[in-house]
């Protein structure tokens, strides 16, 4: 992880709007079917909202019916970190940006082939870099 993991709340509040801060830095969750990228089919690369690290390719995005953008694998194996999450009386696996620690969402073992995984990601935690844009 980079030095971004050591930044304080004030640093992130200056960079993110209130909803993005709640989700990315306080491990919040956006309401299902409300996120900007829930239904997006635009080609490109999804970057971390906090640090612009590439996380997911649109080619791995699919409609899981969950109400959140879902991907079957990250752009590379070490793009995201996984942390055991026992909040809210459940046992889940939290997904974070490996570069800055941004809360992205959770990963579940009910996704499609080839991985069988569903990375259920908050739209507020990512931003789409459209294909051909830099």
UniProtKB/Swiss-Prot annotation:
Co-factor(s): Zn(2+)
Residue span, MsrB domain: 9-131
Pfam hit, one: SelR
Positions bound to Zn(2+): 48, 51, 97, 100
Cofactor note: Binds 1 zinc ion per subunit. The zinc ion is important for the structural integrity of the protein.
Classification via SUPFAM superfamilies: Mss4-like
Highest taxon above the source species: Bacteria
One GO location term (cellular component): cytoplasm
Catalytic site: 120 (nucleophile)
GO terms, biological process: protein repair; response to oxidative stress
Reaction catalysis annotation: L-methionyl-[protein] + [thioredoxin]-disulfide + H2O = L-methionyl-(R)-S-oxide-[protein] + [thioredoxin]-dithiol
Alphabetically ordered keywords of this record: Metal-binding, Oxidoreductase, Zinc
EC number: 1.8.4.12
A GO MF term: zinc ion binding
Family under the similarity heading: Belongs to the MsrB Met sulfoxide reductase family.
HAMAP family associated with the record: MsrB (MF_01400)
NCBIfam families: peptide-methionine (R)-S-oxide reductase MsrB
Protein name: Peptide methionine sulfoxide reductase MsrB
Species annotation: Saccharophagus degradans (strain 2-40 / ATCC 43961 / DSM 17024)
Name of the gene this protein is made from: msrB
């Amino acid at each position: 992880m980079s030095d971004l993991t050591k930044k304080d709340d004030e640093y992130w509040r200056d960079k993110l709007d209130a909803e993005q801060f709640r989700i990315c830095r306080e491990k919040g969750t956006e309401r299902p079917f409300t996120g900007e990228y829930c239904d997006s089919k635009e080609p490109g690369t999804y970057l971390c909202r906090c640090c612009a690290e590439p996380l997911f390719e649109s080619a791995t995005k699919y409609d899981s019916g969950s109400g959140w953008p879902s991907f079957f694998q990250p752009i590379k194996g070490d793009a995201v970190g996984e942390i055991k999450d026992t909040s809210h009386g459940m046992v889940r696996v939290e997904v974070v940006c490996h570069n800055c620690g941004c809360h992205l969402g959770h990963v579940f073992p009910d996704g499609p082939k080839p991985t069988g995984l569903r990375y259920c990601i908050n739209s507020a935690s990512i931003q789409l870099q459209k294909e051909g844009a830099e």
